[in-house]
């Protein structure tokens, strides 16, 4: 199936059902009190993460999604049925963004997690709600409010512990093949990798981590050169980045300039992503003698003014890959568990929340002030007198 990691859809929550104006009419009760019921709430639209999905391709062909409308209220104090909620299944790792405001509504990072993206309309109130000791035959009702409508941008971000960065042909795909069972395409031309790949690495029995390989970056990627930087978003959830550097580029380019270009593109895309822990990994060390290799590594590290971890590997010959995988496993295990709890202060305020609350408060205030605990509909029925 084709890998699609972005889609724009339109979601519409159901409108609330309107309240009903009705009066009790029975035999011998021709002028009964009000009995108009409330309408039903409109259905809301939710996104739900499902581990059985791995692409957003379905949303490319079906862009409009609408929840059910709430039913109107009816007589005899019958409340209308609430509209059925609409639940859209998306892959784990999906991020929902309001396309108009660019507001991030939330991230779905665990199987079964649900996210409200469009809130259903509030039900209208029937005339029963407006009866009081001074208003015996209210003809007021309220209409249901419209459901929320959103233009929604869905982004699929891969969930991985380790992300690979580097120029095209640096050996990223070869490395992921060496340490996992993933089989991305490998060839001797640039941009062999066109979509992200995931691999599960098992350095020790019962212990593993996930590694992500994305298409290579080149200088000017932020302006759209090459495949651009659209795939960098898949590294946002990684806990550590491996910067793969070709120690002996076949085209004669300077590894120092290539490394600086990658860091520059990373900072242009996201300073937060650029600040993630990053290790330098020199690949294709089998092309140099050991003395020459050591000298070249020291020179590059010095010119880059690099003070972090440095590793040398040959992904093709699988030299140093096992040791690097073990180091990564120990590092990831030493990190505190990720906190995916949503901060209440960061919760999205939906467009109709204030309206709903104000409407309720207004009705409740009137209702509480005027309502008589001893009020009885029968007190205001027509008195029937039988004469002989």
UniProtKB/Swiss-Prot annotation:
Q: Fetch the Pfam families from UniProt.
A: GTP1_OBG, MMR_HSR1
| GO MF terms held by the record | GTP binding; GTPase activity; magnesium ion binding
Family annotation (SUPFAM superfamilies): Obg GTP-binding protein N-terminal domain, P-loop containing nucleoside triphosphate hydrolases
Q: Which family does it belong to?
A: Belongs to the TRAFAC class OBG-HflX-like GTPase superfamily. OBG GTPase family.
Entries under InterPro entries matching the protein: G_OBG (IPR031167), GTP-bd (IPR006073), GTP-bd_Obg/CgtA (IPR014100), GTP1-OBG_CS (IPR006074), GTP1_OBG_dom (IPR006169), GTP1_OBG_dom_sf (IPR036726), OBG_GTPase (IPR045086), P-loop_NTPase (IPR027417)
* Protein's UniProt keywords contain Isomerase: no
Q: Which Gene3D superfamilies match?
A: GTP1/OBG domain, P-loop containing nucleotide triphosphate hydrolases
Required co-factor(s) are:
Mg(2+)
Top-rank taxon: Bacteria
Every copy of the OBG-type G domain together lies at: 160-333
Q: Name one GO biological process term.
A: ribosome biogenesis
Entries under PANTHER family matching the protein: DEVELOPMENTALLY REGULATED GTP-BINDING PROTEIN-RELATED, MITOCHONDRIAL RIBOSOME-ASSOCIATED GTPASE 2
| Positions bound to Mg(2+) | 173, 193
Record EC number = 3.6.5.-
- Domain named Obg is located at 1-159
Q: Which HAMAP family match?
A: GTPase_Obg
| Gene this chain is encoded by | obg
Species assigned in the record: Shewanella sp. (strain W3-18-1)
Main localization, broad class? cytoplasm
Q: What is this protein called?
A: GTPase Obg
Query: Keywords assigned by UniProt?
Result: Cytoplasm, GTP-binding, Hydrolase, Magnesium, Metal-binding, Nucleotide-binding
Give the binding site residues for GTP. 166-173, 191-195, 213-216, 283-286, 314-316
Q: Write out the annotated subcellular location.
A: Cytoplasm
Record's keyword annotation contains Nucleotide-binding: yes
Q: What does this protein do?
A: An essential GTPase which binds GTP, GDP and possibly (p)ppGpp with moderate affinity, with high nucleotide exchange rates and a fairly low GTP hydrolysis rate. Plays a role in control of the cell cycle, stress response, ribosome biogenesis and in those bacteria that undergo differentiation, in morphogenesis control.
Binding partners and assembly? Monomer.
A GO cellular component annotated for this chain's UniProt record is: cytoplasm
């Amino acid at each position: 199936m084709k890998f699609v990691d972005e889609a724009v859809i339109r979601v519409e929550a159901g409108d609330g059902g309107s309240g009903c104006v009705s009066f009790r009419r029975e035999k011998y009760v021709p002028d009964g009190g009000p009995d108009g019921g409330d309408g039903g709430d409109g259905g809301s639209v939710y996104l739900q993460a499902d581990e059985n999905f791995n692409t957003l391709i379905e949303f490319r062909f079906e862009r409009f999604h609408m929840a059910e409308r709430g039913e109107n209220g009816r007589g005899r104090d019958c409340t209308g049925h609430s509209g059925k909620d609409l639940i859209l299944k998306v892959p784990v790792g999906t991020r929902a963004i309001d396309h108009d405001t660019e507001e991030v509504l939330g991230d779905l990072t665990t199987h079964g997690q649900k996210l409200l993206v469009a809130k259903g309309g509030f039900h209208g109130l029937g005339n029963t709600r407006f009866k009081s000791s001074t208003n015996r035959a209210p003809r007021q009702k309220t209409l249901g409010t419209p459901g929320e409508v959103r233009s929604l941008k869905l982004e699929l971000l891969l969930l991985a512990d380790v992300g690979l960065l580097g120029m095209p042909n640096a050996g990223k795909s070869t490395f992921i093949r060496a340490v996992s069972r993933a089989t991305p395409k490998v060839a001797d031309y640039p941009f062999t990798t066109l979509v992200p790949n995931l691999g599960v690495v098992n350095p020790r029995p019962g212990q593993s981590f996930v590694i992500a390989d994305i298409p290579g970056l080149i200088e000017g990627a932020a302006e759209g050169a090459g495949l651009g930087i659209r795939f960098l978003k898949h590294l946002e959830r990684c806990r550590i980045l491996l910067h793969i550097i070709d120690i002996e580029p076949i085209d004669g380019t300077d590894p120092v300039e290539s490394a600086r270009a990658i860091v520059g593109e990373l900072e242009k895309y996201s300073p937060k992503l650029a600040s993630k822990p990053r290790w330098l990994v020199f690949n294709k060390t089998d092309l140099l003698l050991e003395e020459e290799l050591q000298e070249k590594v020291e020179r590059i590290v010095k010119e880059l003014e690099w003070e972090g971890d440095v590793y040398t590997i040959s992904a093709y010959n699988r030299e140093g890959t096992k040791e690097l995988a073990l180091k990564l496993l120990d590092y990831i295990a030493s990190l505190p568990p990720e906190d995916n709890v949503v901060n209440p202060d960061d919760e999205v305020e939906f467009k109709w929340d204030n309206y709903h609350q104000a409407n309720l408060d207004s009705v409740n205030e009137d209702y509480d002030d005027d309502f008589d605990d001893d009020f009885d509909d029968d007190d205001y029925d027509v008195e029937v007198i039988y004469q002989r």
